[in-house]
């Protein structure tokens, strides 16, 4: 299992949705990400948040191509503002996580 952080991804894009009470983060993981095994660790405090409101994960079927929603048991836990997210699915592919935090 590999722990991917915002330093080992393609970066984090943020959108401040203050009127709705949360921030949206978009995190791109590289094609070496092993779905169902690897985890994504994000320090939410770096982005002005402390807890998760929701997570969606999209896995690429082929590099840079079609994405499918990884619906097979995406799990997460937050401790001291650090979110650890493990997505379901299988295969070694790139993908995108959409994270809503407050």
Question: What is each stretch, according to the model?
Answer:
Residues 22-26, 54, 80:
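Short, hydrophobic/aromatic-rich segments at coil-to-beta transitions
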Residues 37-46, 85-86:
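Exposed aromatic-hydrophobic patches
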Residues 4, 73-102:
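Surface-exposed interaction regions enriched in Ser/Thr/Asp/Glu
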């Amino acid at each position: 299992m590999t722990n991917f952080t915002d330093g080992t991804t393609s970066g984090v894009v943020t959108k401040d949705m203050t009127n709705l009470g949360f921030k949206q983060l978009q995190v791109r993981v590289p094609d070496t990400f092993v779905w169902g095994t690897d985890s994504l660790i994000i320090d939410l405090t770096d982005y002005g948040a402390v807890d998760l409101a929701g997570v969606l994960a999209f896995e690429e079927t082929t590099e840079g191509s079609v994405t499918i929603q990884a619906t097979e048991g995406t799990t997460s836990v937050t401790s001291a503002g650090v979110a650890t997210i493990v997505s379901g699915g299988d295969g070694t592919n790139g993908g995108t996580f959409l994270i809503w935090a407050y």
